[in-house]
Amino acid sequence: MSASSRPAFGVRRALAGIAAAVVAMATFAPAPAMATMDPEPPVITGAPYVGSTLTVSWDPYAYKGCGAGAGPDTRIYWTRDGEVATDHPTWPNYVLGEEDRGKTIAAHLVANYPCENMEVASEETAPISASHRPSGFTSRSAFELLARRSDGALMMYPRINNTWEPARTVGVGWNIFPTVLSPGDFDGDGNNDVLGRDSAGGLYLYSGDGAGGWTGPRKVGTGWNIFTALVSPGDFNSDGTNDVLARDANGVLYLYPGDGHGGWLPRSVAGQGWNALNTIITPGDFDGDTNVDVLARDSAGSLKLYRGNGAGGWNGMSVVGQGWNGLSKIGSAGDINGDGNFDVFAVDGSGQLKAYYGNGKGGWNGSGVVGWGWGGFTDLF
């Protein structure tokens, strides 16, 4: 499936194909009246990542079955790559698991007897990718910001329903790493992980345990100190596994595809001239086309959106902000305000933590201050 032909997904409508309803006429009896011959297609919400929940909704009165005055009369089932997902209940919600990674999911609505021939199915989703960074670290699909203190303590700040939960310490000694980042689930166990690069260039994987802690570490690379920036965009080439982008001193940007088991596939060049940008962040799908994107700030303070094409490359660039050079830290860790769109956080010179709310179309839907005293952290991710 090409990037251009993949259905729009996330917090938007999944187009549906309509199967015509067929009602047999009983002998010596009038044909029962169909309430709706062409019901509206169902709508699927949710992100196509392991750990996310897909929800199907529809107008129940468009599926009234047969007979005068018949009420809502439907049942639901889900398919995985066209086969009935018998391991999932026939409910409107579908929690995506590791068994769904790389597969496509569809929801089916069937009118119960006597209209058993009436069935409407949504189009299949894009292939499900590994759990991504915005899903958090405690298996709740919550916004959970990691902050490293100068003493090396790693703190987690969960935020649910626009309210911060109490911070908790999830690690010590993390000041040995000049660079830390979260690629999402990098080893294929369904839990989100963290990568740390030490001063000698060793790259270490800390596997998440799904409860806000870590198992490991284990070394997954050497020589990574040749890079001036490391970020994880998520699944940048749409193969179902999470990846890393690395920029060298010459400004060459490399894509290191993850193999889904804590290792790597062969790298490729993803861009040139990226040393003109002093900050690179990875907000996920920022423009609503199902492909993950990259935001980058230049020395003049312009914030640029580089749209991913879903195949390890780009689909154009646009400027989405000015004046961002007044912010000491910029990053993205998911959906801060719970509206279904990915956002950007930033710390200003006074230590205020600001949220810049994405509109799901490559732009903004306002901003707000969501915290104070954040200037003392050496890293936020």
Stretch-by-stretch model annotation:
Residues M1-S2, E119, L265, N315:
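Intrinsic disorder/low-complexity segments
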